[in-house]
Amino acid sequence: IMAARQVWSTPKEMRTGLVTLGRRALLRAAEHQGQLEQVEEELFRLSRLLLKQPELSLLLDDQSADPVAKRDLLAKVLYGKVTAVTEALALQVIGRPERNAIDDVNALSEYAAALRGHKVAVVTSANALTKAQHQTLATKLEGIYAYPMSLHTEVDPSLIGGAIIRVGYEVIDGSTSGKIARLRAQLV
């Protein structure tokens, strides 16, 4: 009914609008089930899995590959590891891609955060953050950005120490490896 009331310029615009409405409905269902934060985190983790598994990502993005086979493969990867909403959203991304699997899944994670009134900060640290560090960082970022923050964390030992924080296109590099690189650049 909602889609019928909309004004669509092209069939492609209508398709995109319907896909967006379907994704929003699934996220609202997760919200009503009290699972929206979990779905957001699962989608983020899936985007990171796809980044770390380029063969899987390339296969899922391959327009010439059988769509049913791609969905079956992803369903096997996700089965029993994520909520039903996360699985449905991920399978829909593969069936109706807008850009590529990684970007589409990541965009859904950010959209889930936005539905909760949050901005996303991706925090890559040399070691896993403690709960206290997580809370302190979230509070500081909320002060900077004037929004509640969803912290999506990942560990990268190559940073040696510290962390890199990404909020949208802004990057705050407080990592030891980043500081060393900046010092090297100054010496040259």
Task: List the predicted regions and their residue ranges.
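Elongated, mostly alpha-helical coiled-coil "stalk/stator" tethers of large membrane protein machines
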Residues: 1-164, 170, 175-188
